[in-house]
């Protein structure tokens, strides 16, 4: 695809703006098929004579009707006339005096590269005008669709009019032979009573208006080619439509027959020319001899595409109340492959392993009476669990028990093995089918490591086979064990398991029972005489029951609900807002909290917890009725008390942190391993403090005391001498420990 020349796109807005013709939405234009020559009418400011100095010959042209369908409301009939003109022929414009001056119609501003198509009211003797069309590709752009009576403008690009600027200066003598020239004539209908229009005109700066038309005498041997473009009804939401007609010209100058037309490189079939007018859809039609090559409608309104999404296959939910029965010999292999070794009708032996959450089942044959079976395990493992005396296993977790039927049999034997007692208890039930109970986990995780268990406790194969077949099934939850109930493996009343739940004691976490993990929002009350049914009980005032409080003879609990309800009713009768929060936000614009009713303190100065404002750590407001209040911002007493309160709170926090740190250190000391008694092979110093060393040290201390007594030392001096002697003895012990590696120490006092 080649790009449309930029000069065509740059000319479109000017041509559209220069026409000055608006579109009417309700115009109903009919298609007019022209099969005979039709006279043409020209609009001229003055009468101009047309004379041609050169003889021109018109070649026969064959045309054929073509019907094109599009989405516009207007219908356009295009008549194409093909002629071949020599590029060297120069035609001088001259107007015969027989033309009549027409009445002035709607004035139209026309640029130098536009062609006007006008209606013809009567026949006139018009010859070929001064426009010589080059055979290198013409582009006639229909810039508007007007009403009946208004001129139709077809614009030619400026590059297509090289000879229009120099027309009336040169004249050549001799016969001028006109090869077939391709001239596109557009006939456009307005309303139903409009007359068809034929003609293409080019405007030059040196002439007013020159129309090229066909006369009956000239076009007797020509056939007009009619292109009928049928339109669909206009939609009410569509805006003005500008139609662009792009006519293709042959690339070379060869004679063109009536049936063949080549598209020149500047004009691409189906190429949509850009349009500068926003919001106006454009209709581009490329017309050639073979018909409409491309027709494209561009509109700014885009409809979102709806993409149909194919529904995904939802997973099938198969809820089965009864277990499936897999019949031997008729197993369908549509989803799973089942390998079942069956020499004879096997029975199922149930195995209970203490401490295991999986239920194991052993397959044994009915004919084998001996308990010596061949152990099968593909992965040798030494992690075995010896069986103890059989007892009901209490399941704390919630494993999934998968029931898979293997084959139907007349009787099902469930055996609970007891290694201590060789005899096993056999329970015969009346179930019509066997069930293999296994957890719904992948196969490598559920293979039991029971290699070294006694006979009768492993998965035994059928005679003649070396493997045990597992039924590969999807993990459907058939039976799920809950903590609230325990289902016994045996299905008969002969073997009954204890239905119980091993409950773990709720251990307090950080000294708080889990049910009471929610921290208390306020401190406990200390009521003694009010029965906790007065508003000065914090628990009662906040609508809560007393819990772990220090109150005595408390009625604020569920046991005394009647008295509690009576007290609540009495408080509400006195004050309907008694149980509402006393500390709330201030008025509009006040961000500080304040008491909703105000305090009534008289002797405390509002600096004790009796004052509700001070207790809430807010200052008294103007609604308080207190006397001698010191709970205001600039009060020195309040600042001192607040500082003391803050200091006390900080002290409590520090004590709590110290207790927590001390407890953590003690726990670390308890859990810290005991240090080794030997260091590097030598003895530690305290190992030298034996009974003999202690006796010698005491003798040394007594000797120092006697010496101080003889010298008459004071009591303080005597104690000092004794302590110095004790220190010397300890240093001797330590030094002896340091020399223990080299030579044995000798204690000297």
From Swiss-Prot:
One of its GO terms (biological process) is regulation of DNA-templated transcription. Zn(2+) 6 binds at residues 606, 620, 626, 629. Keywords: Acetylation, Activator, Cell cycle, DNA-binding, Isopeptide bond, Metal-binding, Nucleus, Phosphoprotein, Repressor, Transcription, Transcription regulation, Ubl conjugation, Zinc. Zn(2+) 2 binds at residues 525, 539, 546, 549. GO terms for molecular function: metal ion binding; minor groove of adenine-thymine-rich DNA binding; transcription regulatory region nucleic acid binding. The modification N6-acetyllysine is found at residues 244, 249. It is found in: Nucleus. It comes from the Eukaryota. Zn(2+) 5 binds at residues 599, 613, 620, 624. There is a cross-link at residues 139, 357, 639, 659, 661 (Glycyl lysine isopeptide (Lys-Gly) (interchain with G-Cter in SUMO2)). The record marks 574 as: Interaction with DNA. Residues 523-536, 599-612 are annotated as: DNA-binding. SMART domains: CXC. Its main location: nucleus. Residues 521-634 form the CRC domain. Component of the DREAM complex (also named LINC complex) at least composed of E2F4, E2F5, LIN9, LIN37, LIN52, LIN54, MYBL1, MYBL2, RBL1, RBL2, RBBP4, TFDP1 and TFDP2. The complex exists in quiescent cells where it represses cell cycle-dependent genes. It dissociates in S phase when LIN9, LIN37, LIN52 and LIN54 form a subcomplex that binds to MYBL2. The CRC domain mediates DNA-binding. It contains two CXC subdomains (joined by a flexible linker) which are both required for efficient association with target DNA. Each CXC subdomain coordinates three Zn(2+) ions. This is Protein lin-54 homolog. The lineage of its organism: Eukaryota, Metazoa, Chordata, Craniata, Vertebrata. The gene is LIN54.
């Amino acid at each position: 695809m080649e790009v449309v020349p930029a000069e065509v796109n740059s000319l479109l807005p000017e041509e559209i703006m220069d026409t000055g013709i608006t579109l009417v939405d309700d115009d109903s234009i009919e298609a007019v098929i022209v099969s005979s020559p039709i006279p043409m009418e020209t609009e001229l400011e003055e009468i101009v004579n047309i004379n041609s100095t050169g003889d021109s010959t018109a070649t026969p042209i064959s045309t054929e009707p073509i019907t094109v369908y599009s989405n516009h409301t207007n219908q356009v009939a295009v008549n194409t006339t093909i002629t071949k003109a020599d590029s060297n022929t120069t035609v001088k414009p001259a107007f015969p005096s027989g033309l009549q001056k027409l009445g002035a119609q709607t004035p139209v501003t026309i640029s130098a590269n536009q062609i006007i198509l006008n209606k013809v009211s009567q026949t006139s003797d018009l010859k070929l005008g001064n426009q010589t069309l080059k055979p290198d590709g013409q582009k006639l752009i229909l810039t508007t669709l007007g009403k009946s009576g208004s001129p139709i403008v077809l614009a030619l690009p400026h590059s297509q009019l090289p000879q229009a600027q120099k027309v009336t200066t040169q004249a050549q003598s001799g016969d001028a032979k006109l090869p077939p020239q391709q001239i596109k004539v557009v006939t456009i209908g307005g309303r139903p009573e409009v007359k068809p229009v034929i003609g293409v005109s080019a405007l030059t700066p040196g002439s007013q208006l020159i129309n090229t038309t066909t006369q009956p005498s000239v076009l007797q041997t020509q056939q007009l080619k009619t292109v009928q473009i049928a339109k669909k009804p206009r939609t009410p939401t569509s805006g003005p439509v500008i139609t662009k007609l792009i006519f293709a010209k042959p690339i070379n100058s060869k004679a063109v027959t009536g049936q063949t037309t080549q598209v020149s490189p500047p004009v691409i079939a189906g190429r949509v020319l850009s349009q500068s007018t926003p919001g106006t859809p454009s209709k581009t039609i490329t017309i050639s001899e073979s018909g409409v090559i491309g027709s494209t409608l561009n509109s700014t309104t885009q409809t979102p595409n709806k993409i149909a999404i194919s529904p995904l296959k939802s997973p099938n939910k198969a809820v089965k109340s009864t277990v499936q029965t897999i019949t031997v010999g008729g197993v369908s292999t549509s989803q799973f492959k089942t390998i079942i070794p069956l020499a004879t009708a096997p029975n199922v032996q149930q195995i209970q392993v203490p401490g295991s959450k999986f239920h194991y089942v052993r397959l044994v044959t009915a004919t084998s009476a001996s308990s010596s079976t061949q152990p099968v395990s593909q992965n040798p493992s030494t992690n075995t669990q010896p069986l103890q005396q059989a007892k009901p296993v209490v399941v704390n977790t919630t494993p999934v028990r998968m029931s898979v039927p293997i084959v139907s049999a007349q009787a099902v034997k469930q055996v609970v093995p007891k290694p201590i007692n060789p005899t096993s208890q056999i329970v015969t039930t009346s179930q019509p089918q066997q069930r293999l109970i296994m957890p719904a986990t992948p196969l490598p995780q559920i293979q039991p490591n029971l290699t070294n268990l006694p006979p009768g406790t492993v998965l035994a194969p059928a005679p003649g086979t070396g493997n045990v077949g597992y039924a590969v099934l999807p993990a459907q939850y058939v039976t799920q064990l809950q903590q609230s109930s325990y289902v016994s493996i045996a299905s008969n009343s002969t073997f009954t398991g204890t239905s119980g739940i091993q409950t773990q004691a709720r251990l307090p976490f950080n000294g708080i029972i889990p049910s009471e993990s929610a921290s208390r929002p306020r401190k406990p009350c200390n009521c003694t005489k009010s029965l906790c049914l007065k508003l000065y009980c914090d628990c009662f005032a906040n609508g809560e029951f007393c819990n772990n409080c220090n109150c005595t003879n408390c009625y604020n609990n569920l046991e005394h609900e009647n008295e509690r309800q009576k007290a609540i009713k009495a408080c509400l009768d006195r004050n309907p807002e008694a149980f509402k929060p006393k500390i709330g936000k201030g008025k509009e614009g006040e961000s500080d909290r304040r008491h909703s009713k105000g305090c009534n303190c008289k002797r405390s100065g509002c600096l004790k917890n009796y004052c509700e404002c001070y207790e809430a750590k807010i200052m008294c407001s103007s609604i308080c009725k207190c006397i001698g209040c010191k709970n205001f911002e600039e009060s020195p007493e309040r600042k001192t008390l607040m500082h003391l309160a803050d200091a006390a709170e900080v002290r409590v926090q520090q004590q709590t942190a110290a207790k927590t740190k001390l407890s953590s250190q003690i726990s670390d000391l308890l859990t810290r391993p005991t240090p080794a008694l030997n260091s590097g092979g030598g003895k530690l110093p305290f190992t030298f403090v034996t009974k003999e060393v202690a006796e010698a040290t005491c003798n040394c201390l007594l000797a120092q005391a006697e010496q101080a007594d003889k010298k008459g030392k004071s009591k303080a001096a005597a104690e000092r001498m004794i302590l110095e002697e004790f220190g010397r003895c300890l240093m001797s012990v330590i030094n002896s420990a340091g020399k223990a590696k080299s030579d044995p120490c000798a204690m000297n006092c």
